[in-house]
Amino acid sequence: MKLTCMMIVAVLFLTAWTFVTADDSRNGLEYLFPKAHYEMNPEASKLNKKEDCEAGGRFCGFPKIGEPCCSGWCFFVCA
């Protein structure tokens, strides 16, 4: 009985979560934070810095998710 109740609650929660996080068909969530884009400092972002990436032709290891190479392509050696 407890397992059934837990499953029902989990399904209801996941269903509600799907509807809450889904995009609005009228683009209602498109401008949820309109000022955040303009207040960002792109130079302060660590994602834009490529200081710790490997140059082309260097060993980058096993193919993996992420960007160890400056080009973003890693298949044992950087492209």
Curated annotation (Swiss-Prot):
Residues 1-22 form the signal peptide. InterPro entries: Conotoxin. GO terms for cellular component: extracellular region. Transmembrane segments: none annotated. Expressed by the venom duct. The presence of a 'disulfide through disulfide knot' structurally defines this protein as a knottin. The cysteine framework is VI/VII (C-C-CC-C-C). This is Conotoxin VnMKLT1-01121.
